[in-house]
UniProtKB/Swiss-Prot annotation:
UniProt-listed CDD domains: SNARE_syntaxin1-like (cd15848), SynN (cd00179)
Organism in which the protein naturally occurs: Caenorhabditis elegans
GO MF entry, a single one: SNARE binding
Keywords recorded for this protein, A-Z: Coiled coil, Membrane, Neurotransmitter transport, Transmembrane, Transmembrane helix, Transport
Gene3D superfamilies: 1.20.5.110, 1.20.58.70
Protein name, as recorded: Putative syntaxin-2
Keyword Transcription: no
Function in brief: Potentially involved in docking of synaptic vesicles at presynaptic active zones.
Tagged with keyword Translocase: no
Residue span(s) of domain t-SNARE coiled-coil homology: 193-255
GO cellular component: endomembrane system; plasma membrane; presynapse; SNARE complex
Location(s) in or outside the cell: Membrane
GO term, biological process aspect, one: synaptic vesicle docking
Amino acid sequence: MRDRLNEFQSRVTDRFDEVELSPARPPSAAEYVDRRFEEVRNAIASVRGEIEKLRRDQQHVLALTIADPRDKNILENQIGTIRRRTGDLRKLVRQAEDDFLEFTKQVQSVTEKRMRQNQLELLKDNLNKLINLFNETHQDYKSRVSVRVRRQLQTVGQDLTDEDINRIMENSGSEQLFFREVNPLSVSGQAAYEDVKKRHGEIKDLENNIAMLEEIFLDLQHLTEAQDEMVTNIDNNVENGLEQVKQGSANVKTAVEYKKSAMRKKICVAAILITILLILIIVAIILAVVLSRGNNNNK
């Protein structure tokens, strides 16, 4: 009994050894571009969640009587993370556009191309809405902080004029005043420091503008390359269409010639048949006359 069990187990093992797993099927062009679109959708949803969390945290900070400077670092880290992820999301959308162009080259179905073109446009529209949401959230927060700081300066600094308040707001920054990083009442003692800080802020703004311009130029370059390829495809399609029209015109002329030739052949055949029929009739008449004369002579 034990030997039979061992023999059965060995047979089962041998059968499993003979089984070979078939290689995984590579994804099709449609599956690949759909996966890329799904990746972009998930990334947009994730960044939108981070923006909503940033808005809640900003509202929490604005509700505090005295803001903690550590909250500022937390908010700045969140804003920096959102900006980095937004930049990564733009690159991901450009990759999705490239994948869609490859998809259009491999797929002939107009319906599938149009469907995925609409999906791509929707993703780009959602990205623009996401960027606008982030900018509106940040601008709303800065505006509310500025209003609160101006109210605090007007309450605390009885000897400050509107010009002093505006200068403090512009040079020091409303967020710095909000988080107690600058003393609003020491205006004259920090004039030099504020001037240096203002110049430093101008340099940082210039660097940010240069980086933004570089990104804009990269986007324009990408769009130009994509449009150049589209124009080339249109030119090729026009040339192919012209060749097909010429070929069709030649085929039509050939068909007309064939039709004329067939008509001439039919006329010739009909004339021959009529001639043969006339000859047969004449022969029959002659035979009838000859036979009738022969009968008369016999009588």
